[in-house]
């Protein structure tokens, strides 16, 4: 499972965050300021100042939701959620193909995430394109939904042709850096939890959870 799509925020939570962060246009700056020298050449959007009061308050809200969500914890094994910021793209703006930096001042990027705060009918274009060995996946989600995908992936955002696209993006430093190892662990954990819910505890299931914990010890950093 290369990526996870999940309803993280309710529509009401998403709209409240959007209302909070768009009240003061002076808090928004050129998105190029947070991009690496290569990615900055293809980045064309605005981002909320990370150190602004509204930026800190709302990014903390998002981080708390992320780190308390059981499905995300199982999928991503987050050691640290970092670099969380809000971006907006108006007509003609987007982000060309690029890969995220492996290391940032805030931590290592194992997984990248985008939380869609605008509803799909509020803008045209703005699809997130993620490139993999299987081809390019085009993603445009409902308000409050998150997509988490490997930071090793080339990805881009199509130009917005109508309306405005507002999202929250950030990175996860995982306890398990390798994507394939992390996917194996997620499948094992999901299967074990499913069996526990369906059949209850058993000696055999204890061995499965033991294997999971010991694999995590071996594969983690």
UniProtKB/Swiss-Prot annotation:
Keywords: Dioxygenase, Iron, Metal-binding, Oxidoreductase, Vitamin C. GO terms for molecular function: 2-oxoglutarate-dependent dioxygenase activity; iron ion binding; L-ascorbic acid binding. GO terms for biological process: DNA damage response; intracellular iron ion homeostasis. Binds 1 Fe(2+) ion per subunit. SMART domains: P4Hc. Its cofactor is Fe(2+); L-ascorbate. It comes from the Bacteria. Fe cation binds at residues 98, 100, 155. NCBIfam families: PRK05467.1-3, PRK05467.1-4. This is PKHD-type hydroxylase P9211_12561.
């Amino acid at each position: 499972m290369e990526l996870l799509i999940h309803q993280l925020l309710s529509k009401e939570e998403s709209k409240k965050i959007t209302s909070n962060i768009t009240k003061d246009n002076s808090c928004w700056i050129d998105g190029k300021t947070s991009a690496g020298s290569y990615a900055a050449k293809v980045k064309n959007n605005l981002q909320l100042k990370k150190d602004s009061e509204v930026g800190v308050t709302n990014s903390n809200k998002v981080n708390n939701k992320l780190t308390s969500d059981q499905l995300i914890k199982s999928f991503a094994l987050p050691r640290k959620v970092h670099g969380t910021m809000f971006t907006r793209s108006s007509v003609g703006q987007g982000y060309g193909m690029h890969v995220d930096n492996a290391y940032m001042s805030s931590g290592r990027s194992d997984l990248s995430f985008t939380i869609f705060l605008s509803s799909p009918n509020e803008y045209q274009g703005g699809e997130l394109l993620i490139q993999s060995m299987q081809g390019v996946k085009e993603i445009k989600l409902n308000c409050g939904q998150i997509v988490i995908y490997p930071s090793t992936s080339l990805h881009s955002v199509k130009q917005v042709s109508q309306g405005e696209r507002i999202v929250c993006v950030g990175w996860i430093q995982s306890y398990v850096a390798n994507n394939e190892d992390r996917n194996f662990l997620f499948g094992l954990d999901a299967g074990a939890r499913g069996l526990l819910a369906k059949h209850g505890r058993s000696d055999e299931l204890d061995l499965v959870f033991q294997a999971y914990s010991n694999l995590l010890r071996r594969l983690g950093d």
